[in-house]
């Protein structure tokens, strides 16, 4: 049986992982990893385990580890070496297993460490990305400064890089994807389908707790750095039309 591991940093990615398990990966063994980049992730993983959705579920203190690394030059050097050799990573249980495919979206350094370790277990591992909203359809491949050190050294050692192993891009609207990966359509979530039923058990879906009539789902660019896309001005205009008291962001 094919074994997949899906790394999730946001709730949107987690919902995609659930839908993938219920559709394209229905007859495959799927491990899901949910990180502390999202609040309450540890509790959600406990609930997911109780619902028996995936073969394995793990909580990963990824964000916490990243913050610790920023203050520890020795740890940074150690993990840089791990990106090159694939040895001695974070010590998570999922890092020591064999997988046929790794699916992710956020290309953080810690993801590259996990990739390097999984590659050692299976040099034929397939790497895929999945979408994080429409903006992600136009995502280019970002090469960090460390990649200019890591990638050539991996090639000298006869090891492929993360980008060289990439194949698929899982998304809801493949016709909109213009990147270099192979677009694979995730079936849309049906209102009365299995994924919707799971989500209603995982989360409180009652609308009674929200007095606002409209919800604005923002991206990260305007409030977490990167290139602003002007969302703040858009929100102001929407609020002027519908009223501040009717809008939750």
How would you name each of these model-derived features?
Residues 240-249:
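Catalytic donor nucleotide-activated moiety binding site of glycosyltransferases and closely related
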Residues 4-14, 222-232:
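Short, glycine-rich nucleotide/cofactor-binding loops
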Residues 132, 137-224:
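A nucleotide-sugar donor-handling region in carbohydrate enzymes
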Residues 21-23, 91-95, 200-210, 238-239:
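Short boundary motifs at domain starts and secondary-structure transition points
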Residues 1-4, 97-99, 205-215, 219-220, ...:
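A short, charged/proline- and glycine-enriched loop
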Residues 152, 234-237:
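Histidine/cysteine-enriched polar flanking segments
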Residues 5-171:
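Active-site and donor-binding regions of nucleotide-sugar-utilizing enzymes
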Residues 74-77, 81-84, 192, 196, ...:
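A conditional alpha-helix N-cap/helix-loop micro-motif detector
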């Amino acid at each position: 049986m094919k074994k997949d591991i899906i790394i999730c940093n946001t709730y949107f990615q987690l919902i995609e992982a659930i839908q993938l398990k219920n559709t394209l990966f229905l007859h495959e063994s799927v491990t899901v990893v949910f990180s502390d980049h999202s609040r309450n992730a540890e509790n959600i993983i406990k609930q997911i385990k109780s619902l028996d959705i995936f073969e394995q579920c793990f909580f990963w203190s990824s964000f916490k580890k990243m913050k610790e690394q920023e203050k520890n030059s020795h740890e940074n050097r150690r993990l840089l070496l791990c990106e090159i050799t694939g040895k001695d990573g974070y010590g998570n249980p999922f890092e020591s297993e064999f997988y046929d495919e790794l699916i992710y979206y956020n290309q953080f350094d810690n993801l590259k460490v996990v990739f390097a370790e999984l590659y050692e277990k299976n040099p034929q591992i397939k790497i895929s990305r999945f979408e994080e909203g429409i903006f992600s359809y136009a995502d280019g491949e970002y090469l960090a400064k460390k990649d200019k050190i890591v990638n050539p050294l991996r090639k000298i050692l006869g090891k492929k890089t993360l980008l060289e192993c990439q194949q698929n891009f899982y998304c809801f609207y493949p016709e909109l994807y213009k990147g270099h990966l192979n677009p694979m359509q995730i079936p849309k979530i049906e209102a009365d389908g299995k994924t919707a039923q799971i989500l209603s058990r995982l989360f409180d879906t009652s609308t009674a707790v929200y007095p606002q009539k409209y919800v604005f789902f923002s991206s990260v660019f305007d409030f977490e750095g990167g290139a602003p896309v002007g969302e703040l001005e858009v929100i102001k205009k929407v609020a002027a039309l519908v009223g501040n008291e009717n809008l939750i962001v």
